[in-house]
Every structure is written in C-alpha cells, then in structure tokens.
C-alpha cells in the first residue's frame, strides 16, 4: 500500500463521490476535518467539480464562503458537486491508505438485497451486485475465467505468461503477485500483524483474522443447499457437504481404506 506525501491546497473543495461513497449522513459532519480524497488521480483546482457557470475556485462563491449547513452539502452531493467549508483541507497528493482502512471497518452500512451481504462502501456494493447479474465481467482470453474487477484480470494473465516480477530479497523466490510475496515474507519472519480485537489472538494473514472473527459472533453465513444447515466457516460446510457427495478423500496409508471424515 503506497503512502504518498500529502500537500495541502490553499482553497477548499471536495469531490462529492468520496463522502457519498464512504460515509452516511451522520458521519460526514464529524469527518470533514479528517478526510482524504478518494482515488481520482492527482488533484488540482482545475480538476475539481464546480457550480455551473464557475470557471475557477476563485469565482465560485460556494468555495469562498463555505457551505450553508450540512443539509445543503448533502443535497449537492447527489449531483456530484460538493461544497465544503473553507477550513477543510484538500490534498493534492493523497494516500490510498484511508480508503484501504475503511475496508476493515466494522461499519458496513451498504447491504445487498440479493444475498444480504454487507459492505462498507457504496462502490463496493455496486461492484458486488454484478456477481448476481453477471454484468460487465472481465474475461481472460487465455482460460475464459471471468472477474468482476479489472484489476483481478491481470493476475491470471501473469500466470499464463509465466511472468514473476515480484522477488523476495532474502531467498530470491519470485511470484506473479505482490500480495503473495507479502504473505511469503510474513511466513519467513513469523510476524503476525493481524490481531483480533476481541481475544487478542494474532494471525499472519488478514483472511485468517476475518474467518476467526466469526467465532465471536452468532453469524453463520455458510449454508448447506441440501439440508439448510448453517455454519460459521466455509471449510466446515465443505466437510459437511462430503456426506451428500459420497466422496471419501481421507485414505489410510496402511490398509488403503477411505473415509469421508478425517
């Protein structure tokens, strides 16, 4: 996750999509002084959205005088024009770290009507809905596999080409994804950076922590389509489903007898 130096602009202006995407109404007011812009490239005044008829920030009375209450701001948000208080700082070079941190927040207000899954960002919910509609999927020309994110499409392409640009400086082992290299380094160091806030247990991978957190809740998101039984973890559901498939994956090395449970 790249961290960029933040440079504060003299004038105040903020794109609406950031606030609309990440915060609900009650959180926007408290967040004004802390926000960083969403991923829109390198921002300058010429890139910001202004009122009709305004050619620059200096000509826009809204930017000079700030906004007249929170409600006015929220109304403008819907039209993709957001006027902020003149004391709100705008970043020219901003970090993606705030956006990344929001993914790990417990506040997941945006719920999918199809599968009841909750997400922390509106853009994530919009993208998630495509899973159900199969809309605008990105297809790999080599293997035909489809993805709902264009960034995920680059991963199988590197597998097909054999390209491994990410190299471990310690052992020299190379990987086709930077995330796999990161996991590899953590295994080498024994570091467990992902800690459970409930019990303090630490994990090497964020996915392991996410799976662990379900233990502390009553949530059982994994349901068997055969009998309707629900489980907290997908591996438990997978083991349960073997009962219906007749599969016996666990084999005794001594006599060769196979079993459906370990």
Swiss-Prot record:
Query: Which InterPro entries did the record assign?
Result: Znf_C2H2_sf, Znf_C2H2_type
The Gene Ontology biological process terms listed for this entry are:
regulation of DNA-templated transcription
Descriptive protein name:
Zinc finger protein 138
**Which residue ranges traverse the bilayer?**
none
Fetch the Gene3D superfamilies from UniProt.
Classic Zinc Finger
Cystine connections: none
Instruction: Tell me the lineage of the source organism.
Output: Eukaryota, Metazoa, Chordata, Craniata, Vertebrata
List locations, semicolon-separated: Nucleus
What is a single cellular component term in the Gene Ontology annotation?
Answer: nucleus
SMART domains xrefs: ZnF_C2H2
Family, per the entry?
Belongs to the krueppel C2H2-type zinc-finger protein family.
State a single Gene Ontology molecular function.
DNA-binding transcription factor activity, RNA polymerase II-specific
Per its database record, what is this protein's job?
May be involved in transcriptional regulation as a repressor.
Source species of the chain: Homo sapiens
Highest taxon listed in the record's lineage: Eukaryota
Report C2H2-type zinc finger ranges.
Answer: 110-132, 138-160, 166-188, 194-216, 222-244, 250-262
Pfam families found in the cross-reference section: zf-C2H2, zf-C2H2_6
Sorted alphabetically, the keyword list is:
DNA-binding, Metal-binding, Nucleus, Repeat, Repressor, Transcription, Transcription regulation, Zinc, Zinc-finger
Where does this protein chiefly localize? nucleus
């Amino acid at each position: 996750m790249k961290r960029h130096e933040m440079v504060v602009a003299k004038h105040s202006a903020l794109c609406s999509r950031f606030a609309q995407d990440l915060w609900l109404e009650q959180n926007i007011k408290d967040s004004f002084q802390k926000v960083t812009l969403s991923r829109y490239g390198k921002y300058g005044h010429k890139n910001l959205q202004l009122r009709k008829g305004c050619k620059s920030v200096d000509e826009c009375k809204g930017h000079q005088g700030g906004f007249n209450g929170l409600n006015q701001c929220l109304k403008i948000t819907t039209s993709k024009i957001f006027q902020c208080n003149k004391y709100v700082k705008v970043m020219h070079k901003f970090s993606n770290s705030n956006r990344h941190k929001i993914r790990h927040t417990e506040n997941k207000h945006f719920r999918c009507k199809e599968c009841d899954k909750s997400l922390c960002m509106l853009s994530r919910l919009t993208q998630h809905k495509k899973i159900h509609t199969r809309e605008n999927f990105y297809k790999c020309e080599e293997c035909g596999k489809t993805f709902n994110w264009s960034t995920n499409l680059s991963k199988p392409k590197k597998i097909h080409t054999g390209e491994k640009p990410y190299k471990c400086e310690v052992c020299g082992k190379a990987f086709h994804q930077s995330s796999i290299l990161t996991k590899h380094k953590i295994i080498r160091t024994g570091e467990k950076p992902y800690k459970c806030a409930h019990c303090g247990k630490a994990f090497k991978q964020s996915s392991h922590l996410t799976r662990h957190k379900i233990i502390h809740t009553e949530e059982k998101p994994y349901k068997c389509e055969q009998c309707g039984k629900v489980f907290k973890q997908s591996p438990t559901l997978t083991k349960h489903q073997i009962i219906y498939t007749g599969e016996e994956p666990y084999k005794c090395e001594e006599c060769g007898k196979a079993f459906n449970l370990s």
